[in-house]
Amino acid sequence: MKKADAPARARELRDRIRAADHAYYVLDQPLLADAEYDRLMHELQALEADHPELVTADSPTQRVSGAPSERFERVVHREPMLSLGNVQSDDELQEFDARVRRLLGLPDGEPVGYVVEPKLDGLAVELVYRDGAFTSGSTRGDGVNGEDVTANLRVVGGLGANRGVPHALEGRPPPRVEVRGEVLLFKEHFEAMNRQLVRAGEAPFANPRNAAAGTLRQLDWRVTARRPLSFIAYEALLPGDDPWRTHWEKLEELAAWGFETNAENRRCRGLAEVLAYRDRMAERRFELPYDTDGIVVKVDDLDWRRRLGAASKFPRWAVAFKYPPQEEATRIRRIWASVGRTGVLTPVVDFDPVRLSGAMVARATLHNEDEMRRKDILEGDWVLVRRAGEVIPEVVKPLPERRTGAEQPFRFPAECPVCGARVVREEGEKVYRCTGAACPAQLVGRLCHFAQRRALDIEGLGEKLAAGLVERGQVKDFADLYAVPFEVWQQLFSRPRKEQDAGAARELPEKSAQNMVAALERSRKTTLRRFLFALGIPQVGEATAATLARHFGGLARVMDADEEALKGVRDVGPETAAEIRAWTQEPQNRRVVERLLAAGVTPEAEVVEARGPFAGKTVVLTGGLSTMSRDDAKAEIERRGGRVSGSVSRKTDLVVAGEDAGSKLEKARSLGVRIAGEEEFVRLLKE
């Protein structure tokens, strides 16, 4: 190629690759087959190697390089990334405004200038730029220490969303600047990504925040690159004195440097304007392209901010107002019984679709017959529904004043709706059970339980794939999963495609099948506690599985333990011991375990620390943690010899209280149980 033609060809290749990325990962409409995409990428790489002057900071070839990381390094923030205090009422907002005015010594009637913005529901990060170039990035972590996720942040916004992390700043940036903001998934991108996961046979994410947090903390940057994350900036910090007088000037400077800032940001003069903004945003919150659960109110004047300072956890110059949960009235269409892995029949409520927290919802579950009777839920009722925690659909209560007399109580079937076996409710139990040993619904549930992330973590094996395997007669127990032919996986991943998609469609089932085989291969190496939990032994949850693994130290000893030995295990009572013994002595169960071992599944005992602040302690987790997921926190405690319980009692040694901690925190206070915040919890993990 002539040198004069190289710049135009490089631009063309970059544009085509970006368009293909955007179409595949955001729009869910592949433009190119994988082979054609790889050819274009290789051509661009070769062209840039021959002409280094053509390399741009935002070229697809420059997103990141290198192998996946094995762990994230710790980063100490130059200035702490403090969380915000929460308020939920007008009175509390007025108290905040009054406190600001009092601390500043403002005369009565002089309004405070505020900047208000939607509270973004994503993951807070910090980006460091030197001489205009992006050099490093980290998560908020515990506010003092974060995790180095530079490689992943380099690919945020690499799918044409125009809301990414700039590799080079525009204009005249300072020698060093720290930019803070939120990594998030816009609703359209989240929905497209979930469609793609379902198409590949993988479990979709529950909400955009979980998806964004999980994606940014991937050890393999290539996973992050394939997902349409965005970044919105809201803060800039310099090592010396700020050249800005107001926060609003900072936001304007961030936009001039090439960052996306929130178009809904506003300046308000006084509390009355803040309340008016809050009301407008509450009405529009579900029309916005991203999830938001409130607004953030910040003092605009930076000199005033310095005078106000910060308390131990929160700045005194800012506060977050959180919206109350949205509730809607709807009418129940029907109540029916769903069959789970243990044969338990769970009442499911189908109702007229309603929009809750930005999503259409048409179904919720009731735990059992007693809950249904306690709430007085009837078929045909008008009810109030909400999404608990903005995620899980929940029937709150009926609206008896709207009853017509045609409503009827739901009665559990006498026969299983899936296999036709007898349904029973044993004396003393709250649930109805299917007695069919070969019930397909139970097998599908057991397979999903076996494959879930906290068990053997077989990525991509969800309910639809499990049902397909059962329908084809390929799988009758866990061990059969490891003998499913590659061609069967291909068939399960195949689906009709439009003619114009044929090039990509031919490769998709094979690639998805390869991913499934790889996931099964990875699952062969596991821990004893995960393996015991995956087996679905009655009354053996994660905590009991971990306790059994620590006590016995090997699978053979668990399988051969008699009731007396089992009763000698901490927190294993006579009933649980009897259930475990009955399960391990059932010949069919022993055959499944033997076949799993023969298939190469190797459950190994973990080395548990015998000393340290968690050794031998019972810990309860409540509220949300910003530094890690609940599952990760639980695993860290158990690795250090602790036990995680779901309820607070006098036997509880420690309660870890995160954001929005609830009744467990109150009970811990009433019982005098030691309480640790997230910062102290992270410190204890390091001891």
Swiss-Prot record:
Residues 609-687 form the BRCT domain. NAD(+) binds at residues 34-38, 83-84, 117, 140, 182, 298, 322. It comes from the Bacteria. Its EC number is 6.5.1.2. The active site is at residue 119. It holds the Pfam family BRCT. One of its GO terms (biological process) is DNA repair. InterPro entries: BRCT_dom, BRCT_dom_sf, DisA/LigA_HHH, DNA_ligase, DNA_ligase_AS, DNA_ligase_CS, DNAligase_adenylation, DNAligase_N. Its cofactor is Mg(2+); Mn(2+). GO terms for molecular function: DNA binding; DNA ligase (NAD+) activity; metal ion binding. Keywords: DNA damage, DNA repair, DNA replication, Ligase, Magnesium, Manganese, Metal-binding, NAD, Zinc. The keyword Manganese applies. It catalyses: NAD(+) + (deoxyribonucleotide)n-3'-hydroxyl + 5'-phospho-(deoxyribonucleotide)m = (deoxyribonucleotide)n+m + AMP + beta-nicotinamide D-nucleotide. It is an enzyme of class 6 (ligase). Zn(2+) binds at residues 416, 419, 434, 439. GO terms for cellular component: cytosol. SMART domains: BRCT (SM00292), HhH1 (SM00278), LIGANc (SM00532). Belongs to the NAD-dependent DNA ligase family. LigA subfamily. DNA ligase that catalyzes the formation of phosphodiester linkages between 5'-phosphoryl and 3'-hydroxyl groups in double-stranded DNA using NAD as a coenzyme and as the energy source for the reaction. It is essential for DNA replication and repair of damaged DNA. This is DNA ligase.
